[in-house]
Amino acid sequence: MLDTLLAEAREDENVIGVVVHGSRGRGLHLHEGSDWDVVVVVRKRTGRYDSAERGGELEASEVTSLADLPRWMLPAFTWTTPVLDKTGAVAAELAEITRVDPATAAEPLDDYVNSYYRSAKNARVGLGLAALLDAQESIPHYLDFLFAAHGRMRPYNKWLEWELREHPLPVDVDLDRLERIALTRNLDDQLALFRETEGVARKLGHGATIDAWEPDLAFLRGH
């Protein structure tokens, strides 16, 4: 089915390029029923390539710009290359929409510290469930910060291990520790994670976000 669409797209002057995204785009986590998720970049929308319904073997949609895609969808396009790019513009736009400004890492860093702080405070007064939920909520904020601080978009959870293995960050990410935090809200693990995160934050120019947590920094550092 993809071959048929590509043959049409190559002959169609309205088409600029075609991108296969998701699991097919990476060749990862595929199974017998895996569908093809396709975006066709066109000069003008006509609906010619839009799938009539969801759930088929191939689901295609037309856009005039990849920048029009919803933000939640963008991790599906990281580490993919166009299967058709008549002008080179599609590859350039792919690189642009999956790039993250490291300056934006301050917000998820602050969110991470807030969740860790709440977890530690709740644990101290015996609110076990609240402490666990806050610990779990801290993890996506931590990952958002870590990837954004290095100019990258956090992957979907299903691709996290693959991405760290195939495209590692320049800092270690202890996934076993993250799993322990999510399952047990262990404060020793949370403290170790905060100390590491503070070091990364200061090294990459986000020390002001950490300093804004005074006078609670001593508590956050386990003192």
Please tell me what each predicted stretch does:
Residues 4, 10-13, 86, 104, ...:
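Short linear motifs in intrinsically disordered/low-complexity regions
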Residues 37, 73, 80, 160-163, ...:
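Short linear interaction motif-like sites in intrinsically disordered regions of transcription factors
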Residues 48-125, 222:
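Conserved NTP/Mg2+-binding pocket subregion across the NTase superfamily
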Residues 96-223:
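Conserved nucleotidyltransferase catalytic core and NTase-mimicking acidic/glycine-rich helix/loop elements
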Residues 5, 62, 93, 178-183:
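Generic hydrophobic, helix-prone segments enriched in Leu/Val/Ile
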Residues 40-43, 80-81, 161, 169-170:
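Short, surface-exposed linear patches
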Residues 1-13, 21-34, 39-77:
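Metal-dependent nucleotidyltransferase catalytic core
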